Amino acid sequence: MNHPDIARRVYNHTWKLDPIIRSLLDTDFYKLLMVQMIWGLYPNVNVTFSLINRSKTIRLADDIDEMELRAQLDHALNLRFTKKEMIWLAGNTFYGRKQIFEPDFLQWLENFQLPEYELTRKDGQYILHFHGPWTHSSMWEIPALSIISELRSRAAMKKLDRFTLDVLYARAKAKMWSKVERLKKLPNIKISDFGTRRRHSFLWQRWCVEALKEGIGNSFTGTSNVLLAMDTDLEALGTNAHELPMVIAALTNNDNELRKAPYQVLQDWNRYYGGNLLIVLPDTFGTEAFLRNAPDWVADWTGFRPDSAPPLEGGERIIQWWREKGKDPREKLLIFSDALDIDTIEKTYHHFHGKVRMSFGWGTDLTNDFVGCSPQETATFDALSLVCKVTHANGRPAVKLSDNPEKTIGNPQEIQRYLNFFGNENRVAKPIKT
């Protein structure tokens, strides 16, 4: 792959619009997997996705020009899947399976277009919503977050001269490579790039992916970014997200349906996918509630992704549950992905080594760690805790409780209803990083 001089490209930026999203494949792989399932089973569900800035002290509307934001969103609106991309999706092998995408779904995808957006501003923040069929509005999540993250990076870099930009990227590359050197010391570690949504920029994410490829070889298992997977001949990785149980739960009509909702999602998923895609995401309404009510067949799945519990405590709780179900944890897989930095990766690796199969989905700390890299003192390169979550399904409010109460999403009345139903056991508040 040709390696561009990122600093020079940033400094020589004279074109009218430099698109942040150049392809609908510039998204996380699990979006395509989920949308295929939604297309097949829930085609008539309408949802709203909303931008939520959890870094409340950062006034996004002051940092990012509204006209630039609209121009980038409008550009994404006009994108379509190309013939080359459709051929690749149809012919490539994903998770060891050919034709993971059904021909009818791919035919539908050929004409796919993102739905319109709704953008306003209030008190220094952007209010951004995406309404429409679940199949369509879901696909806005990753591009929207990537656009806002990169626009904020660009705004910060506009203030830097050519030499300062050189120093910035030289330091960031050295910082990244020092992490790679530490990963090399962890035998047989499995790590992948999960950093699309809050990346510094697309070019920087691509450089980080190339650095991991070069630095740790087969220990780098792939990327969640579909476009980068296609362009760099890597595995496209990803399973499923909180939006599935959030929407299914919002659509329920009684307590019995609500109790079954997290497991209905898994049954739906298993109609489409198997093997290493059978990964349980247990924390949408609290991991403890999920494990307490889980049918025995859930223990037969390949693994879990403990997303919001502290890694050591969350992993140990799932290992304990597997043992209670008569399963050998050494044959199971834990995927750690919540706000990982290099210290957390090392600590988690050493703790669970030999106890369970492990994989790490490395996100913002991989693709947007510029802290201390600028010669000029500034906080504008600090990564945001920014999410785009489903907030309504068919007009009903959606809720995410999480194992970390700081990550709870929903209106207060509905949150309390879910807490009363699922319980508050083992939910521990901790500061949100990214």
From Swiss-Prot:
Disulfide bonds listed in the record: none
Post-translational modification: Transiently phosphorylated on a His residue during the reaction cycle. Phosphorylation strongly increases the affinity for substrates and increases the rate of nicotinate D-ribonucleotide production. Dephosphorylation regenerates the low-affinity form of the enzyme, leading to product release.
Gene3D superfamilies: nicotinate phosphoribosyltransferase
Highest taxon listed in the record's lineage: Bacteria
A single GO cellular-component term on record: cytosol
InterPro entries referenced in this protein's UniProt entry, alphabetically: N/Namide_PRibTrfase, NAPRTase_N, Nic_PRibTrfase, Nic_PRibTrfase-Fam, Nicotinate_pribotase-like_C
Catalytic activity, reaction form: nicotinate + 5-phospho-alpha-D-ribose 1-diphosphate + ATP + H2O = nicotinate beta-D-ribonucleotide + ADP + phosphate + diphosphate
Pathway(s): Cofactor biosynthesis; NAD(+) biosynthesis; nicotinate D-ribonucleotide from nicotinate: step 1/1
GO biological process: NAD biosynthetic process via the salvage pathway
Short name of any one Pfam family annotated for the protein: NAPRTase
A molecular function (GO) term: nicotinate phosphoribosyltransferase activity
Alphabetic keyword roster: Ligase, Phosphoprotein, Pyridine nucleotide biosynthesis
Segments forming a coiled coil: none
Enzyme Commission number(s): 6.3.4.21
Residues recorded with modification Phosphohistidine: 242
Annotated family: Belongs to the NAPRTase family.
General function of this protein: Catalyzes the synthesis of beta-nicotinate D-ribonucleotide from nicotinate and 5-phospho-D-ribose 1-phosphate at the expense of ATP.
NCBIfam families for the chain: NAPRTase, PRK05321.1
Name of protein: Nicotinate phosphoribosyltransferase
Lineage, opening ranks: Bacteria, Pseudomonadati, Pseudomonadota, Alphaproteobacteria, Hyphomicrobiales
